[in-house]
Amino acid sequence: MDLRRDALQILKETSRTFYIPISIMPSGLQEAVASAYLCMRAIDEIEDHATLENHTKGILLQSISQTLQAGVDGFAVDAFSIGFKGYEDSLPEVSLRIREWAILAPESIAPRIWDATAAMADRMAYWSQINWKITNEYDLDRYTFGVAGAVGLLLSDLWSWYDGTTTNRMEAIAFGRGLQAVNILRNNSEDLTRGVNFSRRVGITRTFNSMLVVI
């Protein structure tokens, strides 16, 4: 099986928005960015799962995080599937195949992707277990950094690793937060059906508006 080709196909099915730029990236960088996107999409699908209970989401996400933290020079074939036991029929393919996405990136940068994904999975577990209770700007900043701003930092590291490109990491965080603000506003109705309201306070709505300025 050609893992790179398979990953691009899953990426195309998952998000054409991200597939298009990643598909034309040079070799090496393409595998690294595809690995990062698919690993994070894998955990995002669990966080946003429509039927899993929040407690279950937390357990699954923490299992992924712990497995990634234990990685040395790769992962055993069943490293992640052990944690998924009993939920194989509930989770999407992109989540079930996270091991493959984790080993897609070149060895010289893969551990950085594991680290970022593990940290994000832990943060998602925390927020899911408290039902995304965000009551002030401080909470919103923590959430948007944890699930989006940190992606900007990872991408900055990938550019630097590939060819030494230097980026403004504060702006990378702000851009990630802005994109997450768009996602929150766009998915507001869906979130409300599961009892999650990110914008219940006027102050938070103002913060959303300030985040949108960067994009």
Segments (PLM) and residue ranges:
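Acidic catalytic motifs of isoprenoid enzymes
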Residues: 1-215
